[in-house]
A protein has these predicted regions:
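Methionine residue identity
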Residues: 1-2
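Cationic, low-complexity basic patches in intrinsically disordered or flexible, solvent-exposed regions
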Residues: 5
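N-terminal ligand-binding/catalytic initiation module
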Residues: 24-290
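Glycine-rich phosphate/diphosphate-binding loop of Rossmann-like nucleotide-binding domains
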Residues: 288-289, 293-321
Length: 321
C-alpha cells in the first residue's frame, strides 16, 4: 500500500485561530501561522481532531486528500461553522448538555472548538471549565467517547516510559496532572478527574495562546474510594481502592522521573490533589523540574494580583482626589 505523500493543508484551519488567541497573550507566540505538511487522507484525516476542518475543506483539498463523498458537498467557511455550532449549543437544555457538546466538538474538530471558544469567551468559559466541569467530572464515564490525554494507571507503572515515548507527544511543553482525589468541592472522582486537566489545558490554549500539540492532560489513576464510581458499570477507571503511602509515592516518583527524562524542560502543573499530598509533592519536586501547584500557588498569585491592582486603583483615585 502506497504511503500518501505529504501535502500542505491550507492555513484556514488552526492558524487563524492562533492569531486570535495570541491577541489574548501577545508575549506567547507559540503557535505556527504556516500551512501544515500532512500525510493523512480520507477517514484518517477527518478523524484527526487537530487536522479536521469539516465542511471547511476546500474543493482542492478534498481532491488531494480523498475527501469527496466523506463530506457533504457544501464548502463552508469557519464563520459558517461557528454560526451552526453556537446555535446548536444554545439549543441545549442544560449547562451539562452544553459541556458534553463542546467536549465532543473538541474531540472531532479542534479548530472549530477553539474558534467558538475565543469568539464567545465569556459565554464559553463557564461551560469549558468551572462551574460546569464539576458535573463533567462526576459524569465523565457516561460521556467518554474518544481518548484525550493520558490515563496512567497504577497497574501500568512499569509501562509509563513506553507510554510517554510515543512520537505524537514529541512537542509537549506543558502538562496538567491530577490524581482525581480532590476535584473542586466534589471530592474523589477517580478517573473522572481527567475532566480537570482537559479543561485547564483548553484554557492554556484559549487564554495563553499555547498550541494544543504542546499541551498534555494526564490523570494518575491510583484507584478511588468513591463507592458510587466503583459500583457503576460505566466507570472507566481502575476499580480499586486508592493506593496510599509508600506505594503511592513510588508511583508518583516513577511518573515524575519519566516526565523529566522525556521532556527535561516541560512545565508540570499539579491540579486538584488532596491536601495530604499537594504541598508535600510540590516540596519534593519543585527543585527537580519546572513545576507548580495551581491550588497552592496559582490561587495565591491571582489573589495577590487582584490586591495589587486594587491598591493601584485606590492610590490613583486618592491622587486624583
Amino acid at each position: 500500500m502506497m504511503r500518501k505523500p505529504e501535502v500542505q493543508i491550507g492555513n484556514s484551519s488552526l492558524c487563524q485561530i492562533w492569531k486570535e488567541s495570541e491577541m489574548n497573550a501577545p508575549l506567547l507566540p507559540t503557535a505556527s501561522h504556516q500551512a501544515r505538511q500532512v500525510s493523512l487522507s480520507g477517514f484518517n484525516l477527518i478523524n484527526s481532531p487537530r487536522l479536521n476542518k469539516g465542511t471547511a475543506f476546500t474543493d482542492h483539498e478534498r481532491d488531494v486528500f480523498d475527501l469527496h463523498g466523506l463530506l457533504p458537498p457544501h464548502v463552508g467557511s469557519l464563520d459558517d461553522q461557528i454560526v451552526r455550532r453556537i446555535q446548536a449549543l444554545r439549543d441545549q437544555p442544560s449547562p451539562f448538555n452544553k459541556y458534553s457538546l463542546l467536549r465532543d466538538l473538541q474531540d472531532t474538530n479542534e479548530t472549530l472548538f477553539y474558534a467558538l471558544l475565543l469568539r464567545n469567551i465569556e459565554e464559553m468559559l463557564p461551560l469549558v471549565y468551572t462551574p460546569t466541569v464539576g458535573e463533567g467530572c462526576q459524569r465523565f464515564s457516561e460521556i467518554w467517547r474518544k481518548p484525550r490525554g493520558l490515563f496512567l494507571s497504577y497497574p501500568n507503572k512499569d509501562r509509563i516510559d513506553r507510554i510517554l515515548s510515543h512520537h505524537r507527544y514529541d512537542d509537549v511543553k506543558c502538562i496538567v496532572v491530577s490524581d482525581g482525589e480532590r476535584i473542586l468541592g466534589l471530592g474523589d472522582q477517580g478517573a473522572g478527574g481527567m475532566g480537570i486537566p482537559i479543561g485547564k489545558m483548553a484554557l492554556y490554549t484559549a487564554l495563553g495562546g499555547i498550541h494544543p500539540e504542546h499541551c498534555l492532560p494526564i490523570l494518575l489513576d491510583v484507584g478511588t474510594n468513591n463507592e458510587d464510581r466503583l459500583k457503576s458499570p460505566l466507570y472507566i477507571g481502575w476499580r480499586h481502592n486508592r493506593v496510599r503511602g509508600e506505594e503511592y509515592d513510588a508511583f508518583v516518583e516513577v511518573f515524575v522521573n519519566s516526565v523529566k527524562k522525556r521532556w527535561p524542560h516541560v512545565l508540570l502543573q499539579w491540579e486538584d490533589f488532596a491536601r495530604s499530598n499537594a504541598a508535600r509533592l510540590l516540596d519534593r519536586y519543585k527543585s527537580q523540574l519546572c513545576t507548580f501547584n495551581d491550588d497552592i500557588q496559582g490561587t495565591a498569585a491571582v489573589a495577590t494580583a487582584a490586591l495589587l491592582s486594587a491598591l493601584n486603583v485606590a492610590d490613583s483615585g486618592a491622587r486624583r482626589a
